[in-house]
Design a protein with these regions (language model features):
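N-terminal hydrophobic/helix-forming segments and targeting peptides
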Residues: 4-9, 14-757
C-alpha cells in the first residue's frame, strides 16, 4: 500500500533548514528550532526529515525506512549497541469539516492518554499543519459570561465537544485555505523556562529523548568497540510501530530506549515518592529501585556513579510494541533512560534541563565519547530560547509592515500584561499608542485610571458632556502565599473557568519587573482514570509550581506575595480578519478609544466648539468596576450627560453556544450592548445609535448579552449609560476571538458619537 507522505509546511521547512545550516556550520543540532516542529503520532515526517538533515550536516550518513524511522550506524563488528528514542507525541488529526467552517478532530493515539487530555485542549491555541502551510487555530470553548445562564452547557470533558476554529465560516473557506481532512493538529504553546532551569511545554516528555540522542549523535565516533546505531523511531504512541520495524530490520546485542518511561499499572504518575525534576537521570528496570550489577541497567548505574551523575533506578514498563503478529524480542541486555517529569502528557509537562544534561553525559560516557561541559548558561537543550528566533516569529510579526493602524495598536495592547490592580504596563502601552499631543494632556488619577479630556470645559456650554470608557485590566491570578515546599498559593483575579488555565504554563509577574515561568497545577487525582473535575469555584485556591523546593528558593527568584500571574500571550491572526489572543477583552475597547482620539485630532475644540469629551481607560473592571466607580464618584457633582462604555459583547457565534442569547455575528459590525447584567440602555438611545450608524454606512448589530459594563456605575449620578462593543467568542479564555472589521466599525462609530451625539 502506498504510504501517505505529508508535505513539509513552509514554517516547519524554514525551521528544518535553519537547523541543518547550524549543524553544517559545526554548531551542532539546533534543538531549540527542531523542538517547534509538530510531530503528531503518525505525522512525524517533517520532524524526521529535519533530524535526517541535521545528522547529515554532522557528516553522518542517516538511513530511513517506510515508516520514516531515521538511524545512523558507526563502527563494525560486535557488540551491536542500539540506542533508540521516539519522535512522536499525542495530538489530533482533522476528521471532519463542518458546513460552518469548523474542524472536528480525532485523537492520535485514538485512546485518551489520560483523563484530562481532551479537557486541556478546550479554548487553547493550536496549529493545523496543512500540505502548504501552518494555520493558526484555536479550540472553541464555552463563553465564561454565558455559562451561568445555560441549562446544559457543554462539560468540555469529551472529544465529541471539541471544535477547531481557524477563522473560516464555511467548508469552502476551509479548503480554500489549504486545510483538509487528515491534517494533523497540535497545541501551539512554545516551551517556557520554569523557575531557573526547568522547562515546560506540550510534549516535553516525548521530546527529551530525541533531543538528548540528537545531541549525542552530533559527536558520534568510532571510539567504542563494535557497532553503534542511534535511531529515531516514529509512531511509538500508536503501538511502537516504528520500533517494531526497526528491531525487525536491525537486531542488536544490547539496547537503550531513551525517553518517556512508562509507569507500571497501578502506580500513579503523581506518586509522592517518585523522583522529581532535579533528582537526576532515571534508569528504568522491570522492578524495584536497585539494578543488578551484571545487567545493562546495573552497568549504567555504575557508570553514572563513576561520572558523578545523579541517578535513580525506577520500575518501568518496556516500550510498547503492539499490533498484529508477534513483536520482536528486546535484546537480553536492555535498559531504559529518562528523566523525571511532572504533569506528564499535559500541555505543561515539566522536566529539569540539568537532568537532561546529565542524561546526555551518561550516554556519551556509555559510548566513550568526550563529554563536553554543559551548564544552564550554555545549554543545547534550552528549547525556550527559540521563542525569540526569527523563524519563530508569530504571523502577526511578519505582516506588521502592511497591517492597519488599528491592528498594530491592538497587537501592542493585547501583548501588554496587566491583571486587575496591576495595570501599569497597559497604561504605558496605551500612552505609547496615543499621539504626542494627546499624551501630554493625559493624566493618571488616584485609582490608576488614564484620563484624557478634550473640548470645552466651560459651564453653560451648548454641547454635551460625553465620557468614553474602556478598561485596561485583564483576568489573572495573584500570589497569596508561598508554601514551605516552594509552590505558590494563588487566588483568581476575575471570573473564568479554571480548567482553561490549570495544567498549562503561566508567568509570575514580579514586583521587580521580571517574569518567572511556572505551571498551574491540576487538581489532585488528575492522573487517575476515574478523575472528575471538581465543581467550578472562584474561591478555591490554586497552586503553581515554579521549579523550587522551598520558600527560600522561590523568594530567591524574586517572587513575593502580591505578585500577579497571567498566561504567556501571543497575537495569533486566523483566516480573514479574525484574531485570537487573551485580553481582547478589553484591549479592543482600549484600541477603539485610541483610534478615536487619533481621528479627532488636537484641534477638536476648535472644530466642534461647545462639546466636552473625556476618554477614560479604567482599572479594576474585572473585579467590580473599581476604577470606573472611583472616576464616576469624582465627577458626580458635574456628572457627564452620557457614558459610552466600550466593552465586549460576548457572542453566541460559536458551536459551543445556543443562539437564544447574545446573538451577534463576528464580522457583521459593532454591537449596541442594549441589555446585560448591569444595565439596560434607554431604548430611544439604542434606536438613535442604530440610526446614526445606518446613516453613515457603519455596520451595526444590537442585542442582549451577559456580564457587566463600567457605565453602570455612572447611572446613580444621573448619567445615561449607552453600552457598546464588538462581538467576541470564547470569553475569558486563552483564545478570545474577534474580527478586526468589527473594531474598525466600532472606532468609526465612537468618532461619530464624539462629534454628532
Amino acid at each position: 500500500m502506498k504510504r501517505l507522505l505529508h508535505a513539509i509546511s513552509p514554517v516547519a521547512f524554514a525551521l528544518a533548514v535553519a537547523s541543518t545550516a547550524a549543524a553544517a556550520s559545526g554548531a551542532g543540532p539546533d534543538i531549540a528550532r527542531l523542538s517547534r516542529i509538530p510531530a503528531v503520532a503518525g505525522y512525524e515526517q517533517t520532524l524526521a526529515g529535519a533530524v535526517q538533515r541535521s545528522l547529515a550536516g554532522e557528516g553522518l550518513h542517516p538511513n530511513t525506512d517506510n515508516l520514516d524511522d531515521v538511524w545512523v550506524t558507526v563502527g563494525s563488528g560486535s557488540p551491536h549497541r542500539l540506542i533508540v528514542a521516539s519522535l512522536d507525541q499525542p495530538g489530533y488529526v482533522v476528521s471532519q469539516i463542518t458546513a460552518q467552517g469548523y474542524l472536528r478532530v480525532q485523537r492520535l493515539p485514538q485512546s485518551e492518554p489520560n483523563a484530562v487530555f481532551d479537557t486541556l485542549s478546550f479554548a487553547q491555541p493550536a496549529v493545523v499543519a496543512t500540505t502548504d502551510a501552518e494555520l493558526n487555530a484555536g479550540f472553541a470553548g464555552v463563553n465564561t459570561h454565558l455559562a451561568p445562564g445555560r441549562l446544559n452547557p457543554p462539560s468540555m470533558t469529551h472529544i465529541d465537544e471539541l471544535y477547531l476554529d481557524i477563522g473560516a465560516r464555511s467548508a469552502a473557506e476551509v479548503r480554500a485555505a489549504g486545510a483538509d481532512v487528515l491534517d494533523p493538529v497540535s497545541l501551539a504553546q512554545p516551551p517556557i523556562t520554569v523557575g531557573a532551569d526547568d522547562e515546560a511545554g506540550p510534549g516535553a516528555g516525548d521530546r527529551l529523548g530525541w533531543e538528548a540522542l540528537l545531541e549525542v549523535a552530533s559527536r558520534l565516533g568510532p571510539r567504542a568497540s563494535g557497532t553503534t546505531t542511534i535511531a529515531f523511531v516514529t509512531q511509538q504512541w500508536l503501538g511502537g510501530r516504528g520500533l517494531t520495524r526497526l528491531l525487525t530490520e536491525l537486531p542488536a546485542d544490547e539496547m537503550i530506549f531513551v525517553g518517556r518511561l512508562q509507569t507500571p499499572a497501578g502506580v500513579t504518575a503523581a506518586h509522592a515518592a517518585a523522583p522529581q525534576p532535579g533528582d537526576g537521570v532515571l534508569i528504568g528496570g522491570e522492578g524495584g529501585t536497585q539494578a543488578s550489577g551484571g545487567d545493562l541497567a546495573g552497568a549504567l548505574q555504575s557508570l553514572a556513579s563513576g561520572q558523578h551523575i545523579p541517578c535513580s533506578v525506577v520500575a518501568a514498563e518496556p516500550p510498547r510494541m503492539a499490533g498484529f503478529g508477534r513483536a520482536p524480542a528486546l535484546p537480553q541486555r536492555f535498559a531504559q533512560l529518562g528523566v523525571p517529569t511532572l504533569f506528564p502528557v499535559t500541555p505543561a509537562e515539566t522536566f529539569s534541563r540539568a537532568d537532561l544534561r546529565g542524561l546526555a553525559r551518561l550516554l556519551e560516557a556509555y559510548l566513550r565519547e568526550p563529554t563536553p561541559r554543559m551548564s544552564a548558561a550554555d545549554d543545547p537543550f534550552d528549547a525556550a530560547r527559540g521563542s525569540d528566533l526569527p523563524e519563530r516569529l508569530a504571523a502577526s510579526e511578519r505582516v506588521t509592515a502592511s497591517a492597519s493602524p488599528t491592528v498594530i495598536t491592538l497587537r501592542a495592547l493585547t501583548l501588554a500584561y496587566g491583571a486587575s490592580g496591576h495595570e501599569e504596563a497597559v497604561r504605558q502601552a496605551v500612552l505609547a499608542q496615543l499621539p504626542d499631543w494627546a499624551r501630554r494632556r493625559t493624566k493618571t488619577d488616584a485609582a490608576g485610571n488614564l484620563v484624557l479630556s478634550m473640548g470645552s470645559s466651560a459651564r453653560g456650554r451648548q454641547g454635551p458632556d460625553l465620557v468614553f470608557d474602556a478598561h485596561l485590566d485583564e483576568i489573572g491570578f495573584e500570589v497569596t502565599q508561598i508554601e514551605s515546599d516552594g509552590r505558590l498559593q494563588v487566588k483568581n483575579i476575575g471570573g473564568f473557568f479554571g480548567r482553561y488555565y490549570l495544567g498549562h504554563v503561566t508567568l509570575v509577574h514580579t514586583s521587580g519587573g521580571h517574569a518567572v515561568g511556572g505551571v498551574m497545577e491540576l487538581p489532585q487525582g488528575w492522573d487517575r482514570p476515574d478523575f472528575k473535575w471538581p465543581p467550578h469555584s472562584r474561591t478555591r485556591p490554586s497552586y503553581v509550581y515554579v521549579g523550587t523546593r522551598s520558600a527560600a528558593q522561590t523568594e530567591n527568584l524574586g517572587i513575593r506575595v502580591g505578585d500577579y500571574l497571567t498566561i504567556p500571550k501571543e497575537y495569533r491572526p486566523l483566516l480573514g480578519s479574525l484574531v485570537a489572543v487573551r485580553s481582547n477583552d478589553d484591549r479592543v475597547g482600549d484600541t477603539a478609544l485610541v483610534e478615536t482620539v487619533r481621528a479627532l485630532g488636537p484641534d477638536f475644540a476648535h472644530k466642534w466648539p461647545g462639546r466636552h469629551l473625556t476618554f477614560v481607560w479604567t482599572t479594576g473592571e474585572e473585579v467590580g468596576l473599581d476604577g470606573a466607580a472611583a472616576y464616576a464618584a469624582g465627577v458626580a457633582k458635574h456628572a457627564p450627560d452620557v457614558v459610552f462604555a466600550i466593552d465586549t459583547f460576548v457572542s453566541s457565534d460559536s458551536p459551543m453556544e445556543t443562539q437564544r442569547l447574545a446573538d451577534a455575528v463576528l464580522g457583521q459590525g459593532f454591537v449596541v450592548r442594549a441589555v446585560d447584567n448591569s444595565n439596560i440602555d434607554p431604548p430611544a438611545d439604542v434606536a438613535r445609535v442604530i440610526r446614526m450608524a445606518h446613516d453613515h454606512d457603519i455596520p451595526v448589530q444590537w442585542g442582549a448579552t451577559a456580564g457587566g459594563n463600567d457605565g453602570a456605575v455612572y447611572t446613580r449620578y444621573g448619567t445615561v449609560d449607552v453600552a457598546m462593543g464588538w462581538p467576541m467568542v470564547y470569553s475569558h479564555s486563552p483564545v478570545e476571538t474577534v474580527n478586526t472589521k468589527d473594531i474598525d466599525a466600532l472606532s468609526r462609530m465612537t468618532e461619530l458619537l464624539a462629534t454628532q451625539w
